[in-house]
Amino acid sequence: MINIKLYEGLNLKHLTLLGQGYQGKVYKINSSKCIKIFKKREVCFDEIETLVMCQKDSHFPKLYSFGEDYIIREYIDGIELDKYLSKNKLTSYICENIIAIYKAMNSVGFKRLDIALFHIFITPSNNFKVIDTARAMKKESIYPSILLKGLDSLGYKDDFLS
């Protein structure tokens, strides 16, 4: 007998895999929701904690439900900022939105005010959304070194800082 684990009645075999990384896998449920399955329960708890903190800010996905090793959250349709900037120029609009995300991270109480460019999505309606918050409380950092390193690798660090 094959044992298939269901998450809130969802069979992952029937869902589209959006991506996988160090923390786990993300599957699309429908046009508005996705499920993130974590390899480690501790990381899942960290992401739940940070998503709860930022539910009132539009830069972060809505959290719908969760379990000990998964979350169901808002599906963010869009393109990662690093991929976007590899084909498009850095504009003042993009800079303003990066700064707005930094301010939002601070206002919701995150300790780590830094983010990788691939964790920022630009939606088709040109909104900027953060898709991964699990490490936001792990260490204290007010200098966005990861963000600046990403911009530097694309040749935009000096433009951003000017």
Can you say where each PLM-predicted feature lies in the sequence?
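Active-site beta-strand termini and strand-to-loop segments that position acidic
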Residues: 28-31, 74-75, 123
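Conserved kinase catalytic-core helix
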Residues: 82-128, 144
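Protein kinase-like catalytic domain
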Residues: 55, 105-106, 155
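Short beta-strand
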Residues: 19, 62-66, 112-113
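C-lobe/activation-segment region of protein kinase-like
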Residues: 124-162
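ATP-binding glycine-rich loop module of kinase domains
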Residues: 3-48
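Conserved structural core of kinase catalytic domains
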Residues: 55, 59-95
